[in-house]
Amino acid sequence: MTLDLHELKTLLDDVSEGHRLTVDEAENLFKVRDRSSFFITAAADALREKRCGNAITWVKNQNINCSNVCVNSCGFCGYSCKPGDSKAFELTPELVGEKAALAASRGVTEICTVSGLHPAYDLNSYLSIYQAIRENAPGVHIHASNPMEVAYAARKTGCSTREVLEAFRDAGVGTLCGTAAEILVDEIRDVICPEKISTDDWVRIIKESHNAGIRSTATIMYGHCESVTDQVRHLSILRDIQDETHGFTEFVPLSFIHPGTPLYRKGMARPGATGREDMLMIAISRLFLDNFTNIQVSWVKLGLKMVQIGLMSGANDIGGTLYEESISSSAGAKAGEYLDPADMRYISEDLGRTLVERRTDYSPVH
């Protein structure tokens, strides 16, 4: 169904007054293609202001990628290598500790670590990584791993995913990365990441994580071979989980970076999302995910100019400094590995909004 202008404005007014968007209504919003898109972004930004105020938040964090060696071969990934590849690397716990110590010296409040599914990794491998971080960066929040890594550690160790999560928690993991979600539609997963866990397993592990006291982020990767219907199914799954667990700290839309990926080179994906699609993904996420407070716009994926558009389209968070970033850059992203808070302040002040440093749980640092 194509919404005429009157129908669009009426729907947006209803949402601003508390109406929960249906799946069909969200699909219709995603299909808006002309300047009426700006009515959607304006409504989303007004809702952002009502829900979050005018602060733009950011976190001083450092990314540590422990290895790019991976048993999987996801079509959207330009980062992973097989054992013996010339670009393959693996950090020992000692090297992870050195990076963690450097991060601590920079004053970060969060260290984020993810890894390829290394064939030699088991639960103890992950625990040794967390121990190295904890010992070398005491007091720094550990934001680590994702449901795929949890499932992998469980399989390699012969224990349950719940036991893995409890071990992660006891080792100091504060929050789980909500990545490996991609698109939570198995027909699409079978194309882009057939070796990854199913939608049901991802949902189950995320719920187990939340129930174990480990909150997580939530993500979507869009702009490849999925449809608008698939996108909204994904958002609906996340909204249902949040209704049940209240365990998501934020939602992070991740725009597909195409140039260096097998999926694109084989003609199985389009060349990423358009600017309109990026803008509407942020805006409609704000309108549809009425039980999420925080919507993050990814500078790594979009670059600073599009980030600023996202901050006018419903987003309230700009992510982190990172210092190191390998996964998106390997796929062809050009935004770099580090975002200076001075640049964050520049675009925030240009919007007449205040930049506020936060912790992982969104409490202010100062």
From Swiss-Prot:
Reaction(s) the record says it catalyses: 5-amino-6-(D-ribitylamino)uracil + L-tyrosine + S-adenosyl-L-methionine = 5-amino-5-(4-hydroxybenzyl)-6-(D-ribitylimino)-5,6-dihydrouracil + 2-iminoacetate + 5'-deoxyadenosine + L-methionine + H(+)
Residues bound to [4Fe-4S] cluster: 70, 74, 77
Keyword rRNA processing: no
Sequence ranges assigned to domain Radical SAM core in this UniProt record: 51-290
CDD domains: Radical_SAM (cd01335)
Gene Ontology MF terms in the entry: 4 iron, 4 sulfur cluster binding; 5-amino-6-(D-ribitylamino)uracil--L-tyrosine 4-hydroxyphenyl transferase activity; 7,8-didemethyl-8-hydroxy-5-deazariboflavin synthase activity; iron ion binding
CC cofactor: [4Fe-4S] cluster
UniProt cross-references to Gene3D superfamilies, sorted A to Z: Aldolase class I (3.20.20.70)
Pathway stated in the Swiss-Prot or TrEMBL entry: Cofactor biosynthesis; coenzyme F0 biosynthesis
Keywords, comma-separated and alphabetical: 4Fe-4S, Iron, Iron-sulfur, Metal-binding, S-adenosyl-L-methionine, Transferase
InterPro entries: Aldolase_TIM, CofH/MnqC-like_C, CofH_family, Elp3/MiaA/NifB-like_rSAM, F420, FO_synthase_su2, rSAM
Domain of life: Archaea
Cofactor, free-text remark: Binds 1 [4Fe-4S] cluster. The cluster is coordinated with 3 cysteines and an exchangeable S-adenosyl-L-methionine.
Keyword Transferase: yes
Enzyme Commission code(s) on record: 2.5.1.147
Quaternary organization: Consists of two subunits, CofG and CofH.
Family in the record: Belongs to the radical SAM superfamily. CofH family.
Role according to the record: Catalyzes the radical-mediated synthesis of 5-amino-5-(4-hydroxybenzyl)-6-(D-ribitylimino)-5,6-dihydrouracil from 5-amino-6-(D-ribitylamino)uracil and L-tyrosine.
HAMAP family for the chain: FO_synth_sub2 (MF_01612)
Protein name in the entry: 5-amino-6-(D-ribitylamino)uracil--L-tyrosine 4-hydroxyphenyl transferase
Native species: Methanospirillum hungatei JF-1 (strain ATCC 27890 / DSM 864 / NBRC 100397 / JF-1)
